[in-house]
């Protein structure tokens, strides 16, 4: 039997990192079987992640950090290699490592002849960084992965995107500049934290570990908390993405491969909301409370702005990306409104959105590749030509707009109910976003998929067996999360309770809906 202190999380980091290195530096393998090796590595990673969730993690204590390991790294400045997960971190890791093999299979026949294996290597590198971020128990480890992942992301967008090369490089540079700016501001906050707090502890070798920070920061003066909160929030708001620092996302989604957009929007952008919960709420509760209404108003603006902008798009990939701006607004609203129910809904939303948006990006990308354009005005009547693709796009869209019985319903319900108990006006404005969401899914569906097939599009192929196979687990997840959501709600509720947020009278009702 493997010892209880086995470094499971480090192994979960090492497997995709080793796979990426193998593909990146051994050119014969890269030329011969890059995709096969990457897929095998990703499946091994998924199997190990499922084992950790099923046999190692104790779900009876989901709010505590588990699967913990800590090693001194640079003790002079308080940096350790420390990993550990709560139920939220583990669920996000499972989402990430579950989507990676689907992305690799979905893009199996994409042209990568010039440098075969490089794109899968970048995907594996991203997988390693995602595990580090969601398992980081040291602030500097979190920041290292937060910044390091920009390199493979920049390459997947700029070098391995679609369409015009100049547009790809422009979008990749815009993404990089936004992200670097946020990261540098966050670094300033980390340096300020060291300068202001290192003298408050006797042993600085563990200063940046989460338990140390959780001991000193919540009781720190409000001005110190506000500096940390604001500098971190700049980085997380860009990553989330929130209005007005969201404009990099539609440009990126328009030129990135569908698989890149799946990982970027489905998982990597959740680093923003994950950081808001685990760093901003947990470490700077006073500042988070002081900034509550500002954050909630910005969240509602994101809900409405993202939805209205989505309705004005002709590019189907930009449409899907703007829907995500609106969805992230719901997540941020749930995080900062100050309700335990809403926070559980926001965490659930992170998972549900990751599944539905993955399906929408893949399906929209497959349609664009078949038709040779992302312009929705060039399509009509596709449900007669590609009925499976059309049906799955509609199901995914309905899941994203919270149709009852699908994955988006429970989290959106929890966020709105929690918001209503705190602020009726904000809840009513957020409900407008639900109405707008119905328009940005149903109207494009009517434009693209209904009616008589357009000229030149009558012979487009429907989804093949490989593509349908990719969609099976995504649709299954949408159904399971919509119908049997109680286990995930139960796993995430203690994480919200641990932050000391108030419960509300609608708690029993919300929990009942999840069952």
Question: Language model features by range: what are they?
Answer:
Residues 57-80, 168-172, 184-246, 276-294, ...:
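Juxtamembrane/interfacial segments at transmembrane-helix boundaries in multi-pass membrane proteins
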Residues 20-25, 101-104, 130-132, 155, ...:
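Alpha-helical transmembrane segments of multipass membrane proteins
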Residues 1-8, 22-121, 203-215, 498:
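Transmembrane helix-loop-helix hairpins at membrane boundaries of multipass inner-membrane proteins
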Residues 243, 356-363, 427-460:
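Predominantly late transmembrane helices and immediately cytosolic-facing juxtamembrane segments
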Residues 4-15, 85-96, 140-152, 225-236, ...:
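Structural signature of hydrophobic alpha-helical transmembrane segments
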Residues 29-31, 118, 122-125, 129-220, ...:
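Alpha-helical multi-pass transmembrane bundles of energy-transducing inner-membrane proteins
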Residues 1-3, 84, 131-139, 223, ...:
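Helix-coil boundary and interhelical linker segments in multi-pass alpha-helical membrane proteins
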Residues 10-25, 39-52, 93-108, 126-127, ...:
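Central hydrophobic cores of alpha-helical transmembrane segments in multi-pass inner-membrane proteins
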